[in-house]
Curated annotation (Swiss-Prot):
One cellular component (GO) term of this entry: extracellular region
Protein name: Major pollen allergen Hol l 1
Family listed: Belongs to the expansin family. Expansin B subfamily.
Keyword Chloroplast tagged: no
Keywords: Allergen, Glycoprotein, Secreted, Signal
Coiled coil regions, renumbered to chain: none
Top-rank taxon: Eukaryota
Sequence ranges assigned to domain Expansin-like EG45 in this UniProt record: 63-169
Length: 265
């Protein structure tokens, strides 16, 4: 969307918020336009809060609405957060990456840091709202002033979408979810370089030509129900929001097991 169009939409959202605040006493700010993979490198305004432990990764179970596990550990390493509707996008924003920075209060470093979207938030406090892990929120501070910044509670920040760059050796990973069986397969897709988020997933059994389309289940989880037993090995094909396709050949082996993660070769 062009910059001028985005500005008009944000102005309308702000005016509508004022109306709601006058009518009901509480300003419920409508969300801004969706931030897509083709959005560009323009810095936008947002509000930021934080949740969980001060130096933690957010959720108590180190998970979140995307379905990822252990977001406190590499490669996410606690640099995570919840996005509101135009960022989380009903799960299609899971895995996307954003640079964020703050300049006020004085404890802000002004230097950008990168966060991954791993969770959802519904607080209508701004067109764009990042509810960050305590660790990610503190990372915007000058060295040694992390807790001072966290004590601010809520900040104005600048953000922009960027390509995800995982550490060397990180491979696309497909977690076969609990409850999967030969007639039902659910895959959690994670660690996708580039766009980070995924909009389509298909599988193909070894020796067959037909691709089987998976449907969105929730968060970053994709599923398929089939009357024919799925035995594997499977190649997984995924498409990112920007249209990039990737294939992980025979990544799900014959004799696959539920609640098990398989890395691309």
């Amino acid at each position: 969307m062009a910059s001028s169009s985005r500005s008009v939409l944000l102005l309308v959202a702000a005016l509508f918020a004022v109306f709601l605040g006058s009518a009901h006493g509480i300003a419920k700010v409508p969300p801004g336009p969706n931030i897509t993979a083709t959005y560009g490198d323009e810095w936008l305004d947002a509000k930021s809060t934080w949740y969980g432990k001060p130096t933690g990764a957010g959720p108590k179970d180190n998970g979140g609405a995307c379905g990822y596990k252990d977001v406190d550990k590499p490669p996410f390493s606690g640099m995570t957060g919840c996005g509101n509707t135009p960022i989380f996008k009903d799960g299609r924003g899971c895995g996307s990456c954003f640079e964020i920075k703050c300049t006020k209060p004085e404890s802000c470093s002004g230097e950008p840091v990168t966060v991954h979207i791993t969770d959802d938030n519904e607080e209508p406090i701004a067109p764009y709202h990042f509810d960050l892990s305590g660790h990610a929120f503190g990372s915007m501070a000058k060295k040694g002033e992390e807790q001072k910044l966290r004590s601010a509670g809520e900040l104005e920040l600048k953000f922009r979408r960027v390509k995800c760059k995982y550490p060397d050796g990180t491979k696309p990973t497909f977690h076969v979810e609990k409850g999967s069986n030969p007639n039902y397969l659910a895959l959690l897709v994670k660690y996708i370089d580039g766009d980070g988020d995924v909009v389509a997933v298909d599988i193909k059994e070894k020796g067959k030509d037909k691709w089987i389309e998976l449907k969105e289940s929730w968060g970053a989880v994709w599923r398929v129900d089939t009357p024919d037993k799925l035995t594997g090995p499977f190649t997984v094909r995924y498409t990112t929001e920007g249209g990039t396709k990737g294939e992980a050949e025979d990544v799900i082996p014959e004799g696959w097991k539920a609640d098990t993660a398989y890395e691309a070769k």
